[in-house]
């Protein structure tokens, strides 16, 4: 019988049975893989040496202990931006490098690259997959291109115009609640709580033409969406539950599945009913019927969408895009509006100037309602919105995985396979891009005094081919809500300064609380000294 002599290794003689050979071959393969990984890791580390990095508190944890989801973590990110003004390297543990980009010049090659060159990094986005399916947020490649082309008409001005009335109604409902709460004077309100319900109310009407009255009463569908968002944030903090099969064994995993079922069943029912009506009536009669309501909602547009080959979206695709719109449209807008009101509460001179601009626009108009054409007639209010989006961007970062080497303008190369974090917060707070970046100064965005800045210096909605498709929708809703709020209420800062809390969007620990007073009860005159002498950036 064949024997393999291992006597020279001090192991004596071993009969080379097939199992022994298989074991030896497997061990050799594993060893080869380990050696290949070590070589690849070492080579990658050598290529990353051109990028600076802050001192590591621990060789094992890397910079992980400094990356906190609280105010101190936000201050650390700002500190990094002051010391590393274009790009720097961070380590999550001993073997996982991440490049953080904080300057327009270095983010340009990534944001302007095709989705194939710099696709989204899906480690954390993957948690959303069971809820959002293959919508725009989650899809890639040809499927993303196809969906993006078919969805673009849904955000055309002609469609968005009809949504402005919906925005007005939802804001009016929120303000009616505020009037009741402030009947005896000022009230201390959590902006996130109230504005989130208002944005969900608007979205449900714009997407499904459905009024759940969620601002005044409980809605199973709205409760499920809020629970899904909360569970995803909670799971992000529990790395041992990143594996699906473990997560779905937990109580949170079962709650997540149940909430997904509630959301999917609601969306599926609307799509089935609308598809049946379309098939029964035909396109022409369907459009005539919808024209009587003066609103073509998001589901209608997707049902009617066809590409150049006559191919439309399946019901599963439509559900994914509707759920993605609900997810992406409520929290981000609520965060933006909450921080805008916070900044205006801290700067009453700007708040009053916005209020006078709105009053002048709506003078002698009954009822007091913002119309589509009004949105372009509020320049100072728009400046205040943009400056708040710079200072407190709702989405703090975008992650990309390089599928090939990325050459930066200065000649340095980001090696293939590395994760890049485009820090929107870092770019917006970069002192080499924005002088005095922590100061709230709307005049940075004065259209009559344009600054020489890169178009990528201000990216609250991202940029490039994968920018936010709903940014005009979001800005329209923000303008309507802000204009009507300032017309009816004075917003004052709370006694306690909020502590920022980065999650899926930028929140505040324990809520963002402000004091709200109906304007009819405001008797004291605030000093508007800066109106006559506005600061310059």
Swiss-Prot record:
Gene (UniProt): Cyp4f6
**Found in which tissues?**
High expression in liver and kidney. Lower expression in brain.
Q: Name one GO biological process term.
A: leukotriene metabolic process
Source organism (scientific name) = Rattus norvegicus
For this protein, what is any one GO molecular function term? heme binding
* Alphabetized UniProt keyword annotations: Endoplasmic reticulum, Heme, Iron, Membrane, Metal-binding, Microsome, Monooxygenase, Oxidoreductase
Identify the EC number(s): 1.14.14.1
Enzyme class name: oxidoreductase
**How does it sit in the bilayer?**
Peripheral membrane protein
Q: What is its main location?
A: endoplasmic reticulum
Matches recorded under Pfam families? p450
Family to which this protein belongs = Belongs to the cytochrome P450 family.
Q: What is this protein called?
A: Cytochrome P450 4F6
Q: Which reaction does it catalyse?
A: an organic molecule + reduced [NADPH--hemoprotein reductase] + O2 = an alcohol + oxidized [NADPH--hemoprotein reductase] + H2O + H(+)
């Amino acid at each position: 019988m064949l024997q393999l002599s291992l006597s020279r290794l001090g192991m004596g003689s071993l009969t080379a049975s097939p199992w022994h050979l298989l074991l030896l071959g497997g061990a050799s393969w594993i060893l080869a893989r380990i050696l290949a990984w070590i070589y690849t890791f070492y080579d990658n580390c050598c290529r990353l040496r051109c990028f600076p990095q802050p001192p590591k508190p621990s060789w094992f944890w890397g910079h992980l202990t400094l990356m906190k989801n609280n105010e101190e973590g936000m201050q650390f990110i700002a500190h990094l931006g002051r010391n590393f003004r274009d790009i720097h390297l961070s380590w999550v543990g001993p073997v996982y490098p991440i490049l953080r980009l904080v300057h327009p010049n270095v983010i340009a090659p990534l944001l302007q690259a095709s989705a194939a060159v710099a696709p989204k990094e899906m480690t954390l986005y993957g948690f959303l997959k069971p809820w959002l399916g293959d919508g725009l947020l989650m899809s890639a490649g040809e499927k993303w291109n196809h969906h993006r082309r078919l969805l673009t008409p849904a955000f055309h001005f002609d469609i968005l115009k009809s949504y402005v009335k919906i925005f007005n109604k939802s804001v009016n409902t929120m303000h009616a609640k505020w009037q009741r709460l402030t009947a005896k004077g000022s009230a201390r309100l959590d902006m996130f709580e109230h504005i989130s319900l208002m944005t969900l109310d608007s979205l449900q009407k714009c997407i499904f033409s459905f009024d759940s009255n969620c601002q005044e009463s409980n809605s199973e569908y709205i409760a499920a969406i809020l629970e899904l968002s909360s569970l995803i944030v909670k799971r992000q903090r529990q790395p041992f539950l990143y594996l699906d099969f473990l997560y779905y064994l937990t109580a949170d995993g079962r709650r997540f599945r149940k909430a997904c079922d509630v959301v999917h069943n609601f969306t599926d029912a609307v799509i089935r009913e609308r598809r049946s009506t379309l098939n029964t009536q035909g396109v022409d009669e369907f459009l005539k019927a919808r024209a009587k309501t003066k609103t073509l909602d998001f589901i209608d547009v997707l049902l009617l969408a066809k590409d150049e080959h006559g191919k439309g979206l399946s019901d599963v695709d439509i559900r994914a895009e509707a759920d993605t719109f609900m997810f992406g449209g409520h929290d981000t807008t609520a965060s933006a509006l909450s921080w805008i009101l916070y900044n205006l509460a801290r700067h009453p001179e700007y708040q009053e100037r916005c209020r006078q601009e709105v009053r002048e626009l709506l003078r002698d108009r009954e009822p007091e309602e913002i119309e589509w054409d009004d949105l372009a007639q509020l320049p100072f209010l728009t400046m205040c919105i943009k400056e708040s989006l710079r200072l407190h961007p709702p989405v703090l970062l975008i992650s990309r995985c390089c599928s090939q080497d990325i050459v930066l303008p200065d000649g340095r190369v980001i090696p293939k396979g590395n994760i890049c974090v485009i820090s929107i917060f870092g770019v917006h707070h970069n002192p080499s891009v924005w002088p005095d970046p922590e100061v709230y100064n709307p005049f940075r965005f004065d259209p009559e005094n344009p600054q020489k800045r890169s178009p990528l210096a201000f990216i609250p909605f991202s940029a490039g081919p994968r920018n936010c498709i709903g940014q005009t929708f979001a800005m329209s809703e923000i303008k309507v809500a802000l204009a009507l709020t300032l017309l009816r209420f004075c917003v004052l800062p709370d006694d306690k300064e909020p502590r920022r809390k980065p999650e899926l969007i930028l929140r505040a620990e324990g809520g963002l609380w402000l004091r709200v007073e109906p304007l009819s009860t405001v008797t004291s005159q605030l000093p508007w000294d800066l109106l006559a002498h506005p600061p310059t950036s």
